Amino acid sequence: MDFAYSDKVKALQARLAAFMDEHIYPNEQRFYREIATGDRWQPTAVMEELKEKAKAAGLWNLFLPESERGAGLTNLEYAPLCEIMGRAPMAPEAFNCSAPDTGNMEVLERYGSEEHKKQWLAPLLDGKIRSCFSMTEPAVASSDATNIESRIERDGDHYVINGRKWWSSGAGDPRCKIIIFMGKSDPKNADRYRQQSMILVPIDAKGVNILRTLPVFGYDDAPHGHAEIEFENVRVPATNMLLGEGRGFEIA
């Protein structure tokens, strides 16, 4: 395989590095100062300013391969750009290339309905809302996702969701509006990798309770955060199921 950078990638690297020098690095102290002196769990003014500048510079949504909504880059072409963005912890969000939104947006692009894309993907791509991903659970070793115990049960035209998740990345952000939830819809399936499904859950749905945000080595990652969330008899439309029951691992 040829790992040499294409002319397109080299040009983007140069533009991205210049943007980092001009706008990101000089604003790092301001970013952390705004977090420290204001409400830690509210978006900072400087980040919103940087996002608009990145859009104007054509350095927005650089991820999302094989989609007209992205920048037309393969993962191989996107990787060296991530290396540059990764030089400042605040940078990926400024380019709308931060986790878990990038992965969640790709899931919506690949497997969401047109209504999902209109309601959730479009504002995510525009940087107006954020998202979170809920898989890990406190009661089981979730590094092996076949262990998860949360339930997704069909009830007519709805699914009912119950369980407790933690380390739900992005849930602390007040702009977070949608959760991609992974749970078991068919726990008795002989194929352990067909027991799980992924489903969309609005964060303001009745029964979704954010219990606390969790620090990582003492760092709370405000205003993004990693939360412990309780799902108690949460009802969502059956149309919120992604790809189909039992296809959670296929999506992952």
What kind of region is each of these model predictions?
Residues 58, 81-87, 182-185, 200-206, ...:
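Short Ser/Thr-interspersed hydrophobic loop/turn segments at strand-loop and sheet-helix junctions
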Residues 105-111, 133-134, 188:
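Flexible, glycine-rich active-site loops centered on histidine and acidic residues
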Residues 72-84, 144-147, 230, 236:
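Structural signature of FAD isoalloxazine-binding scaffolds in flavoprotein oxidoreductases
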Residues 150-153:
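A structural signal for short hydrophobic beta-strand segments in well-ordered beta-sheet cores
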Residues 158, 162-211:
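A short core secondary-structure module
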Residues 127-136, 181-182:
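A short, Trp-centered hydrophobic/proline-enriched beta-strand micro-motif
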Residues 203-252:
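A glycine-rich, basic-preceded beta-loop-alpha segment at the flavin cofactor/substrate interface
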Residues 1-99, 110, 115-126, 130:
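Amphipathic, small/basic residue-rich leader segments at the start of a protein or domain
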